[in-house]
UniProtKB/Swiss-Prot annotation:
It comes from the Bacteria. Pathway: Cofactor biosynthesis; pyrroloquinoline quinone biosynthesis. This is Coenzyme PQQ synthesis protein B. It comes from Acinetobacter baumannii (strain AB0057). May be involved in the transport of PQQ or its precursor to the periplasm. The keyword rRNA processing does not apply. Keywords: PQQ biosynthesis, Transport. GO terms for biological process: pyrroloquinoline quinone biosynthetic process. Disulfide bonds: none annotated.
Length: 303
């Protein structure tokens, strides 16, 4: 399984266009050791030619320009991407579908709850239905594994996780199963497994066992502390109120990752306020000392 990180930042990217927090100001002026990052999305493939997009970022055009393998150039109009899997209906995971409209029809895999949001509050399915066949909806049963034609060796097992629907969704304060999923992706040829959960509000015993059984875990790294948005003065909500588990301290994701012995451990969906973006920070050093990697745009993993 080939895994390519198209984007590794949380909503707004890094630097966020209107933000002057120490990180955004620092990377913009070149005064901190940090990489520019686009909003989170990854692509996976079993042959290096045909790819599945996991979430469609607002930055997808630039991401695909930088990702040369996504353009096999076999004909006048071509792409290596004809399938998109959505983990949720967040704007930073779905607005990229509008940019992909020239490639319609596109197969879009999502749960019924996500489909409801994307035909009402943010009706992207409706908006694109006249674009050469539009978006072709494939329902994900959050309790059943599925496969995608053309990717015979890859199996996808959804996992219902605790997080939050987007603010525009009627499910925001009325959670439903399927608002958010993680994916266990198994390559039956290599017998390797990826656990992908860019939006994760809680780690329980089931998730711990799944992570231990995986060869790579790529999970939510939005915030270093739960009150980070408040402490930096850019917001009033905690990480948990937004559906994101913080990294540090008791109960943080790092305390769980440190219990894992075998998998490659990667944090993705990093908010622009997170000190781990500064590669000279004590927080980045702490992750490195614990064999936890911070995803970056263009990062490649082979399983």
């Amino acid at each position: 399984m080939h895994i390519y990180i198209l984007g590794s930042a949380a909503g707004g990217g890094f630097p966020q266009w209107n933000c002057n927090c120490p990180n955004c100001h620092g990377v913009r002026t070149g005064t901190i050791n940090a990489k520019v990052r686009t909003q989170s999305s990854i692509a996976i493939s079993e042959n290096g030619v045909d790819w599945i997009l996991l979430n469609a970022s607002p930055d997808i055009r630039q991401q695909l320009f930088d990702f040369k393998a996504a353009q096999p150039a076999r004909k006048l109009r071509d792409t290596g991407i004809t399938n998109v899997i959505l983990m949720d209906s967040q704007l930073d995971h779905t607005t990229g579908l509008l940019t992909l409209r020239e490639g319609c029809p596109i197969n879009v895999w999502c749960t019924e709850m996500v489909y409801q949001d994307l035909t009402t509050g943010f009706p992207v399915f409706n908006m694109l239905k006249h674009w050469n066949g539009g978006l072709l909806y494939h329902q994900i049963d959050p309790k059943q594994a599925f496969k995608i034609d053309g990717f015979e060796n890859l199996e996808f097992l959804p996992l219902i996780i605790q997080s939050a629907a987007p603010p525009y969704s009627p499910h925001r304060h009325d959670p439903h199963e399927g608002d958010n999923i993680a994916l266990i992706i198994k390559d039956h040829k290599t017998q390797k497994q990826l656990f992908y959960a860019p939006g994760l509000g809680k780690i329980d015993d089931q998730i711990m066992q799944i992570m231990q059984d995986s060869d790579c875990v790529m999970i939510d790294g939005t915030l270093w502390t739960d009150d980070e948005m408040q402490q930096t003065g850019v917001g009033k909500k905690t990480g948990r109120e937004m559906g994101h588990l913080y990294i540090s301290g008791e109960g943080g994701s790092l305390s769980y990752l440190n219990q894992l012995s075998t998998p490659k451990k990667v944090l993705i969906h990093i908010n622009n306020t997170n000190p781990i973006l500064n590669e000279d920070s004590a927080q980045f050093a702490e992750l490195k000392a614990n064999d936890v990697e911070v995803a970056f745009d263009g990062m490649q993993i082979e399983l």
